[in-house]
């Protein structure tokens, strides 16, 4: 309805059906297929995480589910700004503003960081209030607090890491983004299997994988940008 009311159909060629351009479709798939695999792998590792937590016991699984619920809520602004970065980087490159891409990424990352600092401050200052939304059991609330603090640290790093990482896909280099994600997720999977199934560490220690994951994602993304900048100068 919005498209019909607001968009100029003739300007964008929407006023008539066009033949399927298989060459264009192939080019789109050659870029998007890496993104599809990337998202699939990211979701699959969460499955592995909860398998490892389940081996620790039902109590630990309950803690993980509660903390994960808060984690997902905190991810909303981060994911929103990361997706925005992807779109704006693509638009800026299309407009010929390649020289301004890094400045744009930095500005969005800074905004994301400060928003997350506020969110984390609320969570850290009022952990029981946040957790009580999901359970009224006092003992479970107390046991969930350490894991919540770990996630709070992870989200501060994620606020910057996700912006820089999603900007890579915005440049069209989805293959590089997939390689970075795969490398990080391999470490993620091995770490959680070891710490959860072999060491059988507490839930809060298991959640430390999120800190490691986002740190590696940020580091690898920055290294890629540094490498590309060096290649451009050469």
Task: For each feature predicted by the language model, list its residue ranges.
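Helix-terminus/linker motif at the lipid-water interface of multi-pass membrane proteins
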Residues: 40-73, 91-92, 129-138
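Residue-level recognition of pore/gate-forming positions within transmembrane alpha-helices
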Residues: 69-72, 185-186, 211-214
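Alpha-helical transmembrane segments of multi-pass membrane proteins
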Residues: 26, 70-74, 138-161, 190
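Short membrane-interface helical motifs at transmembrane helix boundaries
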Residues: 118-141, 145
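Hydrophobic faces of transmembrane alpha-helices in multi-pass small-molecule transporters and flippases
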Residues: 1, 17-48, 73-77, 81, ...
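Conserved small/polar residues in nucleotide/adenosyl-binding loops
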Residues: 225-230
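Small-residue-rich hydrophobic transmembrane alpha-helices
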Residues: 63-125, 158-177
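Alpha-helical transmembrane segments of multi-pass membrane transporters
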Residues: 1-3, 119-123, 179-203, 216-224
């Amino acid at each position: 309805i919005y498209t019909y009311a607001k968009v100029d159909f003739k300007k964008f060629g929407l006023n008539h059906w066009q033949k399927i351009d298989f060459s264009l479709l192939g080019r789109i798939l050659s870029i998007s297929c890496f993104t599809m695999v990337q998202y699939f792998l990211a979701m699959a590792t969460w499955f592995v995480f909860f398998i490892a937590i389940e081996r620790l016991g039902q109590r630990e699984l309950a803690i993980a589910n509660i903390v994960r619920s808060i984690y997902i809520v905190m991810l909303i602004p981060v994911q929103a700004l990361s997706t925005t970065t992807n779109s704006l980087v693509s638009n800026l490159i299309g407009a010929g503003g390649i020289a301004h891409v890094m400045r744009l990424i930095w500005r969005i990352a800074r905004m994301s960081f400060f928003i997350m600092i506020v969110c984390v401050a609320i969570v850290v200052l009022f952990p029981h209030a946040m957790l009580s939304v999901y359970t009224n059991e006092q003992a479970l609330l107390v046991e969930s607090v350490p894991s919540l603090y770990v996630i709070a640290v992870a989200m501060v790093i994620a606020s910057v890491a996700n912006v820089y990482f999603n900007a890579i896909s915005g440049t069209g280099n989805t293959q590089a983004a997939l390689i970075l994600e795969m490398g990080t997720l391999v470490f993620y999977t091995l770490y959680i299997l070891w710490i959860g199934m072999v060491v059988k560490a507490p839930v809060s220690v298991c959640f430390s994988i999120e800190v490691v994951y986002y740190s590696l994602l940020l580091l690898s993304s920055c290294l890629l940008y540094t490498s590309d900048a060096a290649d451009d100068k050469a």
